[in-house]
C-alpha cells in the first residue's frame, strides 16, 4: 500500500477503491484548492505579461505622448493667436483634441504583437504633425 503522504488527497494509483472515496468536506477542500491554484497561476501569468508589455512599450508610449503634447500645444498657441480669423484652424484644433485622445493613440490595431508601430509610424500622430507644420508655415512660426 502506498504512503498516504504521496498524495495529500489519498488518490494515488495504488490505493484501493474504498480509500479513494473522499468525504464531501475533503472533496470540497480539494476542489477549492484546485480552483485557487488555477486562479493564482492565471493572475501570476497576467502580472508577468503585463509588466513585460509595459517594459517593452513604455518608451514608444512616452514618445507618442510627447509628440501629441507638442501637436496640441502648438495648435492651441496658433488657435489662440490666429483662431479668431481662421475658422479652419479652430475646427482643426477641436478635431485634434478629439482624434488625439489616448484611446485613439494607444489602440491595439495600430501596433504589432511586439508592441511596435505598423509601418514604423503612427497614422494619427503623423497626420496631425503634418497639419501643424502646414499652419506653422502659413503663419511663419518656428517650432525648433
Swiss-Prot record:
Keywords: Cytoplasm, Nucleus. It holds the Pfam family Yae1_N. The keyword Signal does not apply. The keyword Cytoplasm applies. It is found in: Cytoplasm; Nucleus. GO terms for molecular function: protein-macromolecule adaptor activity. Its main location: cytoplasm. InterPro entries: Essential_protein_Yae1_N, Yae1-like. One of its GO terms (biological process) is protein maturation. Residues 37-77 are annotated as: deca-GX3 motif. Belongs to the YAE1 family. PANTHER family: PROTEIN YAE1 HOMOLOG. The complex LTO1:YAE1 may function as a target specific adapter that probably recruits apo-RPLI1 to the cytosolic iron-sulfur protein assembly (CIA) complex machinery. May be required for biogenesis of the large ribosomal subunit and initiation of translation. This is Protein YAE1. The gene is YAE1.
Amino acid at each position: 500500500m502506498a504512503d498516504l503522504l504521496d498524495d495529500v488527497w489519498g488518490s494515488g494509483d495504488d490505493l484501493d477503491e474504498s480509500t479513494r472515496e473522499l468525504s464531501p468536506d475533503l472533496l470540497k477542500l480539494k476542489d477549492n484548492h484546485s480552483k485557487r491554484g488555477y486562479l493564482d497561476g492565471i493572475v501570476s501569468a497576467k502580472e508577468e505579461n503585463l509588466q513585460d508589455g509595459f517594459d517593452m512599450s513604455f518608451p514608444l508610449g512616452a514618445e507618442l505622448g510627447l509628440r501629441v503634447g507638442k501637436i496640441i500645444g502648438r495648435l492651441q498657441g496658433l488657435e489662440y493667436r490666429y483662431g479668431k480669423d481662421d475658422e479652419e484652424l479652430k475646427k482643426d484644433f477641436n478635431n485634434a483634441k478629439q482624434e488625439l485622445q489616448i484611446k485613439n493613440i494607444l489602440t491595439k490595431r495600430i501596433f504589432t504583437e511586439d508592441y511596435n508601430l505598423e509601418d514604423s509610424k503612427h497614422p494619427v500622430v503623423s497626420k496631425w504633425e503634418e497639419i501643424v507644420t502646414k499652419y506653422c508655415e502659413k503663419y511663419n512660426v518656428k517650432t525648433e
